[in-house]
Amino acid sequence: MYSVVCLIGSTKFESTFRELEESLTLKGYLIFSPLVYNQSGDKPGCGKKAKELIDVATKLKINHSDIVVVVDVDGYMGNSTKAQRDHALFLNKPVLYYSKGEVSRL
């Protein structure tokens, strides 16, 4: 059986997400990742309501994951990411941090 990894973090790190998606997929992991990258805030239909919907969807992805990876380039974590991380910890999911090099353990 494949382990499911959920990547969480600010979508301003899209290139890091993409690199992790590829490298972890090639190692045999199933990946949940942001599917909407709208850091600039200019995508049509991506207002406050969409952000709330995406936050709920991310928590559902965490519920179905075996491992959560926080994509925290240079240690940066916004409020949404902190809430998602706390949700994972509440569920006793292993949480690894990109900034600490912990992803290499996968």
PLM feature segments, named:
Residues 1-106:
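Conserved catalytic or regulatory cores that recognize and/or transform ribose-phosphate-containing ligands
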